[in-house]
Amino acid sequence: MHVRAPWSLPEPTLAYFPNARFVPSDRDLGAGALRLVGEDCPAPTRGGVAVADGPTEPGFNDFHHVPVLAQRCVELLRPALTRHHADGSEAVLVDATIGAGGHAERFLTELPGLRLIGLDRDPSALEIVRTRLARFTDRVTLVHTRYDGLASALTELGYGAAQSIDGALFDLGVSSMQLDQAERGFAYSKDAPLDMRMNPQSALSGADIINTYDEAALADILHRYGEERFARRIAARIIRRRADRPFTTTAELVALLYEAIPAAARRTGGHPAKRTFQALRIAVNDELGSLRSAVPAAMDALAVGGRIVVMAYQSLEDRIVKRVFADAVASRTPVDLPVELPGHGPRFRSLTHGAERADAAEVEHNPRSAPVRLRALQRLELEALPRQGTGKGES
């Protein structure tokens, strides 16, 4: 297993379970040992997922990462990964958000010939996953990069950025192991430095934004990325407070948010800090910009017959995925023509009817799956399908 870190890295949200406390569950696992080439990754820490209630917190090795909708991901991607051989030989899967490696482990176990490339911007995640996937070392390559570095990673690994892989998987959900590392500043339930960087090597932190951006820019971030209806009110309070002293900790920001949001609003809609923390984290890590580049790059990298699955956990991400997918399945032929013009047919076909959701059994087994929206596409040969409308307006 290999890893590289060719560039510094400037991902989404704590707000999925706004009233929750954190209990160990489904994002981490310790296993054997692997060597990561070219990256000094910190040791793994305990993990957890936000749920409404749960058992007393055990140690890091006492629980198992439960990947969201793992069986459905396998069902959707297996046909593309077994086109050459039933065991996945000669197929390449890119796990663009490998995290603790739950999905990767499932695919590598079920398809003993599959090669997997795992991407993550967080060196802590790579340390955990390299340990978890130790027994698959000859079939796994880990790359320290944001997921919008996918094309560059494939090129540097010798695959090429176009039509070179058979499957791509994006699990955009928040990593509980990052939330559980209090010093990272992601969790509003814990006092910590106001950091929020997915990659500790990145330059911009949450404190930088809070302490240096002007009132209009702060309000725009809170409204655009947090969909916070009190964005202007909060921004004004931040400006007044930092004139006295700069913000340095999450607790200071949480206290201000509690005061800034009206009491009536605090009684509904979850924790008063959830939207602001989401917005700051998205801005610090350029999550949405990265996603807008990453999904099209993954689609371009798919060979004909290849498939992509994307799981989003909040509406801002899902809207981006929905728009990109809708464009990919749309015909470019004018709607008033009865036949498809050469080269104007859809490039992909949808494998899901809109966004799929986790069923009750999945949510009970894995609470983190409650907000998930899964979408999937398959790459087509040009002119592979007869004209059946434009494909626009899919829900």
UniProtKB/Swiss-Prot annotation:
Keywords: Cytoplasm, Methyltransferase, rRNA processing, S-adenosyl-L-methionine, Transferase. Coiled coil: none annotated. It is an enzyme of class 2 (transferase). Its EC number is 2.1.1.199. Pfam families: Methyltransf_5. It comes from the Bacteria. S-adenosyl-L-methionine binds at residues 101-103, 120, 147, 171, 178. Signal peptide: none annotated. It catalyses: cytidine(1402) in 16S rRNA + S-adenosyl-L-methionine = N(4)-methylcytidine(1402) in 16S rRNA + S-adenosyl-L-homocysteine + H(+). InterPro entries: RsmH, SAM-dep_MeTrfase_MraW_recog, SAM-dependent_MTases_sf. GO terms for molecular function: rRNA (cytosine-N4-)-methyltransferase activity. It is found in: Cytoplasm. One of its GO terms (cellular component) is cytoplasm. SUPFAM superfamilies: Putative methyltransferase TM0872, insert domain (SSF81799), S-adenosyl-L-methionine-dependent methyltransferases (SSF53335). One of its GO terms (biological process) is rRNA base methylation. Specifically methylates the N4 position of cytidine in position 1402 (C1402) of 16S rRNA. HAMAP family: 16SrRNA_methyltr_H. Belongs to the methyltransferase superfamily. RsmH family. This is Ribosomal RNA small subunit methyltransferase H. It comes from Mycobacterium ulcerans (strain Agy99).
